[in-house]
Structure formats: structure tokens, C-alpha cells
Amino acid sequence: MRQNTRTSASTVANTLALLGMGGTIAGTGSASGVGYQAGQIAAQDLLGGIAVPTGCVVRPQQVRQLDSKDIGDGDWLALAQACGQQLADPQVAAIVITHGTDTLEETAWFLQCVLPAGKPVVLTCAMRPASAWAAFCTRLSTA
């Protein structure tokens, strides 16, 4: 007799946890990207204008709001704890962490050492602040 191997919709992991740490990606400043201040925009606000596919949920969580050059041990521990809580949730399929460029590789190495394998944990950053994006799109569309 064949068993039903389908899973119900309620058991499918469909949530993306977006953890904000600050950095240039969450920065504000002039449209040119020169003279910005890192870590000013909340993770929730970085989602503005992003189309989320039907059936998917993005759950933002602000862990820290700082320039990544200022990250220390306590910040890494707080991030690891937030990741652990999200990874333990069966609805969470993956984690995306917005971060600054200065300490991105140290954060990636630390998380690789302390988090369990299984679900993807992706770090992303930017070389220009979020406030420069509109000007970038305008220049790109005229190219």
C-alpha cells in the first residue's frame, strides 16, 4: 500500500527571516552615495518596493542598527541567538542578513562555526547606501 507523501500547506516552510544588522545597505545620505551614515534604515523599511512571491512570507527582525566597523562580540552573539531562534521555527525556510561590508567575512565565519547546518543563511551587503538606490536606477535606466 502506498503512503501519501504529500505535506499539507501548513507544514511547508514558506517564511524568509530578514535579520537587520545595519551597515551601508541600511545607510542614508545623498543620492550620490557620498557622505552617508551607515545603519539608519530598519530591516522592515528595506523591504519597500520588493514584490514578495505569493505564498511567501518575509519576517523582518532588527537585531542591531550599526556601522559594521563597530561590531563586537556581543553583537555577534546577539545575531547568532536571533539566527538560532529563527532556524528553530519550522516555518522558516532560510535567513537573509543585511550587514555592512567592513566585517561581513568575520560575521560569516562566526555564524558558520556556531549555527547548525540545514537551512540556508545568507549575508548580503552594499557598497552604496539604500538612499542612493533611486539615483542608481535612474542612471541605469538611461544607459
Which ranges hold each PLM region?
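Active-site histidine-anchored catalytic micro-motif
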Residues: 1-143
